[in-house]
């Protein structure tokens, strides 16, 4: 297995037959969580095979083979589900610009670890996480002295992403870096 990619996190059980809620962390949930899909567990453990998948009130519910009651489902809470990076294919751009063109796209793992600098050349720190919030993606940038900046991951604020050079350039609006 090559490097695993986290595609979801198991949440709380739903009902009494072993269903669990899923915090989706992938571009194509319909493909990643299809019937029969085999998902790894970050940190090890037996793989989980999707026996049933459905959406309920805006949440993805899964049932895995061999997980047949609420107790077994509860034991899976907070497990991070992974796929093999070789199976992932290219990331999918579901955002288009005003001209209908897709933008540059990256896997989260391509961004974590990049140095973040301002357009003036000041070092902000390193990207430690990509947070997929309902209002949009945020880059968590760990500051050298501790703490972090949360930077909206939009072209206007992060005009340059260069994984080959190991850095991103941030053009912060006034006050963004003062908010902690």
Curated annotation (Swiss-Prot):
GO terms for biological process: ribosomal small subunit biogenesis; rRNA processing. Its main location: cytoplasm. Residues 103-176 form the PRC barrel domain. GO terms for cellular component: cytoplasm; ribosome. Keywords: Chaperone, Cytoplasm, Ribosome biogenesis, rRNA processing. GO terms for molecular function: ribosome binding. It is found in: Cytoplasm. The PRC barrel domain binds ribosomal protein uS19. Binds ribosomal protein uS19. This is Ribosome maturation factor RimM. It comes from Frankia alni (strain DSM 45986 / CECT 9034 / ACN14a). The lineage of its organism: Bacteria, Bacillati, Actinomycetota, Actinomycetes, Frankiales. The gene is rimM.
């Amino acid at each position: 297995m090559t490097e695993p990619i986290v595609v979801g996190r198991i949440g709380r059980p739903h009902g009494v037959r072993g269903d669990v809620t899923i915090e989706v962390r992938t571009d194509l949930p319909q493909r990643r969580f299809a019937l029969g899909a085999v998902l790894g567990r970050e940190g090890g453990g037996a793989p989980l095979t999707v026996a049933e998948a459905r959406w309920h009130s805006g949440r993805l519910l899964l049932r895995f083979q061999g997980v047949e009651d609420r107790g077994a489902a509860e034991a899976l809470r907070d497990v991070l589900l992974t796929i093999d990076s070789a199976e992932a294919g290219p990331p999918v751009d579901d955002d288009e610009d005003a001209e209908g063109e897709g933008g540059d796209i990256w896997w989260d793992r391509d961004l974590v670890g990049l140095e973040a600098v301002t357009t003036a050349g000041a070092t902000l720190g390193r990207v430690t996480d990509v947070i997929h919030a309902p209002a949009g993606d945020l880059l968590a940038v760990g500051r050298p002295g501790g703490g972090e900046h949360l930077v909206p991951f939009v072209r206007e604020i992060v005009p340059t992403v260069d994984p080959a050079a190991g850095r991103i350039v941030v053009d912060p609006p006034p006050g963004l870096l003062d908010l902690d």
